[in-house]
Amino acid sequence: MKDDVPNLKDYSSRLREEANMDLADIKADGEISEPTKKTQIVAIYGKGGIGKSFTLANLSHMMAELGKRVLLIGCDPKSDTTSLLFGGKACPTIIETSTKKKLAGEEVKIGDVCFKRGGVFAMELGGPEVGRGCGGRGIIHGFELLEKLGFHDWDFDYVLLDFLGDVVCGGFGLPIARDMAQKVILVASNDLQSLYVANNVCSAVEYFRKLGGNVGVAGLVI
């Protein structure tokens, strides 16, 4: 019976040491490794209304306070990820701006879609109007445009992606399916729906890792 009791000696100090580790140095299985890329891309998932945007707004602000270059990208058709940083105001979305520029015969520039507040760079991918298109396809189109703008050459320390996890659409699973992110963070609570969503995302991560993917689950925020 005694052997079944976990050793809790110095448990608190070990947790503190782990919490102080750089996210880039922690594998999904807990082993330490070298960062695979200079810019660490972290995707956050969870059911709608669980607090993903609130969590990321605070996380990105604290990272900026620590001197990190942080880009926060809202990948939800509601386009409300960055509103907390901008005092409740919505940023012009990439999809909306791209459509207007295309109709005017102009090209989209980075200054049209990327904004800065409190040291955090932020943008919203956006999505189609209700009943007028596919939200997942809008996400894919948004990232294609970001790649044309040199997304991978912007020299950020961290890029934080805010995704809703209620759907199984491939567009919203882009960071996992295409190995765009190094880590996934889940936001959940004690209700069954949020745990169901978290479990689905973990299953997707496991599936693509079996196919050779490198995305891992960094942790769970309750």
Show where each model-derived region lies.
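Short acidic, glycine/serine/threonine-rich loops at helix termini
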Residues: 55, 82-85, 172-173, 198
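Extreme N-terminal, non-catalytic leader segments
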Residues: 1-50, 54-71, 104-107
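Loop/helix-junction capping segments adjacent to catalytic residues or to phosphate/diphosphate-binding pockets
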Residues: 53, 132, 192-195
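Short amphipathic alpha-helical segment that frequently serves as the phosphate-/nucleotide-binding helix
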Residues: 53-57, 139, 202
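Short strand-loop junctions, especially beta-strand C-caps/beta-turns
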Residues: 47, 125-128, 189
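Nucleotide-state-sensitive switch-loop elements of NTP-binding domains
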Residues: 38-42, 65-69, 75-163, 167
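Short beta-strand/turn micro-motifs at beta-sheet edges
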Residues: 30-31, 109-112, 172-175
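Conserved catalytic-core segment of NTP-binding enzymes
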Residues: 7-9, 14-16, 148-154, 158, ...
